[in-house]
Amino acid sequence: KYISGLWSNQLVRGTTILFAGSTLVNLGGFFYHLILARLLGPVEYGSLAALLGLTYLVSIPIGSMDLLVTKMVSSFESSHLLSHTRSFLFYVFNIVCKISFVAFPILVLSTGKIQDFLHLNSPWGIIFTWISVILWLVITLFRSALKGLVKFEGLVTSQIIEMAFRVILSVGLIVFVGKSYLNAQIGTIIASLIGLGVAL
């Protein structure tokens, strides 16, 4: 009864779900890098690591959007203003689309210089990185909304499914198509689309 009483507490249940989900996702990320490092070798994995670093660097501002959306949606939820939540998400999504529409061509134009700087053998690695950043931006919007709505089960499910497909698809493409960091990126992009679909 004591345990069931604790589980009925929204804060305890939400914290437990988030902790368990984050642990599984981090574990999946660990195995992702461990397996890919073994499969790709130092040169290809080094290129992938450099592109992942570029992704994280460009995506730093996304954290601010995460906090803003979560705070706004949670305030609407506490006031039972679901229509406001939908309007707000639609408004932010429109802004994200406009920013992406303007930024993507600019980022693509910078591909050549970044490719030379990182000593990559293909411009597609940079282009796939920009696609991943835009997807990350959109996914963060809807996952932040799930946090604000206290729908931690949906949030964690989306994250776990995305990580699972990221590992499976990336490894599968590398093994059956070719040992290239580009195949790992393609697997990541497809997994992100699946994660976005679950979050919606």
Walk through the language-model features, giving the residues of each.
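N-terminal membrane topogenesis motif
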Residues: 1-28, 83-85, 90
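Alpha-helical transmembrane segments of multi-pass membrane transporters/permeases
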Residues: 15-25, 126-132, 146-171
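Small-residue-rich midsections of specific transmembrane alpha-helices
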Residues: 22, 28-32, 49-77, 96, ...
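Residue-level recognition of pore/gate-forming positions within transmembrane alpha-helices
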Residues: 22, 26, 53-56, 91, ...
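Helix-terminus/linker motif at the lipid-water interface of multi-pass membrane proteins
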Residues: 30-44, 115-116, 172, 177
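Interfacial/gating helices of multi-pass transporter permease domains
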Residues: 33-56, 181, 186
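Alpha-helical transmembrane segments of multi-pass membrane proteins
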Residues: 97-105, 109, 113, 117-142, ...
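Hydrophobic alpha-helical transmembrane segments
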Residues: 126-127, 156-200
